[in-house]
From Swiss-Prot:
Function according to Swiss-Prot or TrEMBL: Part of the small subunit (SSU) processome, first precursor of the small eukaryotic ribosomal subunit. During the assembly of the SSU processome in the nucleolus, many ribosome biogenesis factors, an RNA chaperone and ribosomal proteins associate with the nascent pre-rRNA and work in concert to generate RNA folding, modifications, rearrangements and cleavage as well as targeted degradation of pre-ribosomal RNA by the RNA exosome. Its dissociation from the complex determines the transition from state pre-A1 to state pre-A1*.
One family name in Pfam for this protein: Sas10_Utp3
Biased segments, Polar residues type: 264-276
InterPro entries: Sas10/Utp3/C1D (IPR007146)
Subunit and partners: Part of the small subunit (SSU) processome, composed of more than 70 proteins and the RNA chaperone small nucleolar RNA (snoRNA) U3. Interacts with CPEB1 and EIF4E.
Principal subcellular localization: nucleus
Bias-annotated ranges (Basic residues): 295-315
A Gene Ontology biological process term: maturation of SSU-rRNA from tricistronic rRNA transcript (SSU-rRNA, 5.8S rRNA, LSU-rRNA)
Modified residues (Phosphoserine): 121, 142-143, 204, 214
Source species, domain of life: Eukaryota
Subcellular location: Nucleus; Nucleus, Nucleolus; Chromosome, Centromere; Cytoplasm
Protein name: Neuroguidin
Entry annotated with the keyword Signal: no
Length: 315
């Protein structure tokens, strides 16, 4: 397609964009003029503002000025190579990107201050209402005891030392500070699905499918689990000790149970019919298997009315 045809096809879109831009510029200009008049009339006190917001306003204003200058030169047919406005735009954009972490940290405080300035009071669910008040740490009983001690000291006049009951102690802030929990149910569900997807991607089913359809050479390893190696070392140490000291060591019930569990973990027969949950990858709802959520055995509690069986004494 020739260049004149391209210009003719883009001309209606360019005219529509210019009209829209002109309308937006007029609306923004009217709003800025209204705010300027109110600020000059001291309707909005700006003496105690945030310097970060002021810096952002100045940077955005400079960015718009350089961008307008760049658009003007481009519309006039000038070259943008080595243009000083391009370097300034890159610098301002970099500074604005670096300010994003500060915006995220101050977002909650700024929103709270704006809401307080509009409504004139804090909301009932504001987390700052739950902060510790040092005045509430003073007990009324201690203040009454202090007054009684001072009255007794005034009457007796024996010594000018105060009693240790009413002495003011240094306030120690609590270690657990109340934090505002703003996580929604949708975000919690999203995190749960992400964990299920990671678990499904690392399952043995997906790993075997990758090995089956992969063109890479198959790698065969002969390794032992860490708990099996540790158990073998302990058994060998026990055997060496028994042979050297000529003593048979007793094995507790806990040790027997631990060995039994280790043997079950090392065997591969229990996992022949076990398949991991990959419903998170297929669009289904992930569920907990019996291995992930085992049922706890109930402890047998003896009844109070029963008596222990004992040996009968022979006569």
């Amino acid at each position: 397609m020739a260049a004149p045809e391209v210009l003719e096809s883009d001309l209606p879109n360019a005219v529509a964009l210019l009209k829209n831009l002109q309308e937006q510029v007029m609306a923004v200009t009217a709003q800025v003029q209204t705010l300027t008049k109110k600020v000059q009339a001291k309707a909005y006190p700006t003496e105690k503002g945030l310097s970060l917001l002021e810096v952002k306003d100045q940077l955005l204003l400079m960015y718009l000025m350089d961008l307008s200058h760049l658009i003007l030169d481009k519309a006039s047919g000038g070259s943008l190579q080595g243009h000083p406005a391009v370097l300034r735009l890159v610098e301002i954009r970099t500074v604005l990107e670096k300010l994003r972490p500060l915006d995220q940290k101050l977002k909650y405080q700024i929103d709270k201050l704006v809401k307080t300035a509009v409504t004139g009071s804090l909301s009932e669910n504001d987390p700052l209402r739950f902060k510790p008040h040092p005045s509430n740490m003073m007990s009324k009983l201690s203040s009454e005891d202090e007054e009684e001690d001072e009255a007794e000291e005034g009457q007796s006049g024996a010594s000018g030392k105060k009693s240790g009951k009413g002495t003011a102690k240094k306030y120690v802030p609590p270690r657990l500070v109340p934090v505002h929990y703003d996580e929604t149910e949708a975000e919690r569900e999203k995190k749960r699905l992400e964990r299920a997807k990671r678990r499904a991607l690392s399952s043995s089913v997906i790993r075997e499918l990758k090995e089956q359809y992969s063109d890479a050479p198959e790698e065969i390893r002969d390794a032992r689990h860490p708990h099996v190696t540790r158990q073998s070392q302990e058994d060998q140490h026990r055997i060496n000790y028994e042979e050297s000291m000529m003593v048979r060591l007793s094995v507790s019930k806990r040790e027997k149970g631990r060995r039994k569990r280790a043997n079950v973990m090392s065997s591969q027969l229990h996992s022949l019919t076990h398949f991991s949950d990959i419903s998170a990858l297929t669009g289904g709802t992930p569920h907990l298997d019996e291995d992930q959520n085992p049922t706890k055995k109930r402890k047998k509690i003896p009844k109070k009315g029963r008596k222990k069986k004992g040996f009968r004494r022979r006569r």
